[in-house]
Curated annotation (Swiss-Prot):
This is tRNA (guanine-N(1)-)-methyltransferase. Belongs to the RNA methyltransferase TrmD family. Its main location: cytoplasm. It holds the Pfam family tRNA_m1G_MT. One of its GO terms (cellular component) is cytosol. It comes from Ehrlichia ruminantium (strain Welgevonden). It is found in: Cytoplasm. Its EC number is 2.1.1.228. The lineage of its organism: Bacteria, Pseudomonadati, Pseudomonadota, Alphaproteobacteria, Rickettsiales.
Length: 235
């Protein structure tokens, strides 16, 4: 099954951007996933291709128009009725690995990228958009956020990352949330040694060390991700 992604944006030239590089770009070139970028401005009917207007009730900035965006969405739905509609929004559900895993199982998703002060709320309500945030901060638009979402989904698709253990052992996928510390050659760098257990050849001890590291790092930096009832054995 090919993972199809539709992007609704007023800046189509921003894509594929970072999605054209590394394993995500290779997967795109191989046809493992497909990117369809749609210019919202092409659905504006006036000669100036206007996509925004002043907000009712006053306030700063401009709001993206429901009629223009609605036409763009209708165009997508005319050929993809089952597509999952997503809006990148700071007020949405915070993105995590579980959400990415769920979305990666869809055959078709459509991501709406807002600009200015946002989208006319009627659009989101009428089409029942799923709103997603990538963090507690503000960007100038949804394009960069959409790239983050797409990458987190695509790399979970079989065949994208060649080593499945890489995904299994990653932060938020491993048992205790955050990934253990990683090291490579040289064994001694500026007087700092690689932990001796990692060069011991004892795989049982190595696996235990990784689990302990994962738990301790998670407990220190993201304690809400740890299961305190089971944690004592990893102290």
């Amino acid at each position: 099954m090919v993972f199809n992604v539709n992007i609704l944006t007023i800046f189509p030239e921003m894509f594929p951007g970072t999605l054209g590089y590394s394993v995500i770009g290779k997967a795109l070139n191989k046809g493992i996933w497909n990117l369809n970028v749609i210019d919202i401005r092409s659905f504006a009917t006036d000669k100036h291709k206007t996509v925004d207007d002043k907000p009712y009730g006053g306030g700063p900035g401009m709001i993206m128009k429901a009629d223009v965006i609605g036409s763009a969405i209708d165009n997508v739905l005319s050929t993809n009725k089952e597509t999952k509609l997503i809006y990148m929004s700071p007020s949405g559900v915070k993105l995590n690995q579980d959400i990415s895993g769920q979305l990666a199982h869809f055959s078709n998703i459509t991501i709406l990228c807002g600009r200015f002060e946002g989208i006319d709320r009627r659009v989101l309500d009428f089409y029942d958009f799923y709103e997603i945030s990538i963090g507690d901060y503000i960007l100038s638009g949804g394009e960069v956020a959409s790239m983050v979402l797409i990458e987190t989904c695509v790399r979970l698709i079989p065949g994208v990352v060649s080593n499945v253990d890489s995904i299994r052992d990653e932060s938020f996928t491993a048992s205790y949330g955050l990934e253990y510390s990683q090291y490579t050659r040289p064994a001694n760098w500026r007087g700092l040694e690689v932990p001796s257990v990692l060069v011991s050849g004892n795989h049982k001890k190595i696996n235990l060390w990784k689990t302990q590291q994962s738990y301790r790092i998670t407990k220190q930096r993201r304690p809400e991700l740890t299961n305190t009832a089971d944690g004592d054995i990893y102290e």
